[in-house]
């Protein structure tokens, strides 16, 4: 477990939603765990993790929360803010974990979409998470602002958006939407474009 708050430079470097994220080989995961009691929710924990050699950050979080001995009679909501979306294998493990813990719901807001050499695997992993009930979204200014004020040692400095934050969020949101679209809708769109001569 890393210290509770991230350094400003580390957060800005790793979470910046730039198109070409050279040199960013680590994945950071900021999390909030809440227990839902009827109409209210109670925060149980928050913090951040980063991948360690040989273990992706998503699996580190699953190990961490598995040690909690969660009450199966209560509902829990976990929210992740990640610098990269999960790889295929991590998505598979997370979906399986949720299947065995139906009282736990997960939302993931990611800064960037991760694609390995096999560009078909990661999108399938995201679809698998979506089918498992995970809400997946791209981080927007509001999410960065929340993270800055919750997870970053900000020394009372206000979060300032970098050039391109909004445009890159919109571009990535469109890309994620295309990935999560049911395949028949994608085929319908392709047919429509063919009919229009595109």
UniProtKB/Swiss-Prot annotation:
Pfam families, per the entry: APOBEC_N
Important for interaction with CTNNBL1: region residues: 39-42
Ranges of residues in domain CMP/dCMP-type deaminase: 23-129
Keywords on record: Cytoplasm, Hydrolase, Metal-binding, mRNA processing, Nucleus, Phosphoprotein, Ubl conjugation, Zinc
Motif (Nuclear export signal): 183-198
Chain positions recorded as Zn(2+) binding sites: 56, 87, 90
PTM summary: Ser-38 is the major site whereas Thr-27 is the minor site of phosphorylation. Phosphorylation regulates its class-switch recombination activity. Probably monoubiquitinated on several residues by RNF126.
GO biological process, one term: somatic hypermutation of immunoglobulin genes
Compartments where found: Nucleus; Cytoplasm
UniProt short sequence motif Bipartite nuclear localization signal, positions renumbered to this chain: 1-30
Residue positions where Phosphoserine is found in the record: 38
Gene Ontology CC: one annotated term: nucleus
Keyword ATP-binding in annotation: no
Catalytic activity: a 2'-deoxycytidine in single-stranded DNA + H2O + H(+) = a 2'-deoxyuridine in single-stranded DNA + NH4(+)
Region (Interaction with SUPT6H): 2-26
Modification type Phosphothreonine: residues: 27
Entry function: Single-stranded DNA-specific cytidine deaminase. Involved in somatic hypermutation (SHM), gene conversion, and class-switch recombination (CSR) in B-lymphocytes by deaminating C to U during transcription of Ig-variable (V) and Ig-switch (S) region DNA. Required for several crucial steps of B-cell terminal differentiation necessary for efficient antibody responses. May also play a role in the epigenetic regulation of gene expression by participating in DNA demethylation.
Protein name (Swiss-Prot/TrEMBL): Single-stranded DNA cytosine deaminase
Organism of provenance: Mus musculus (Mouse)
Organism lineage string: Eukaryota, Metazoa, Chordata, Craniata, Vertebrata
Annotated gene: Aicda
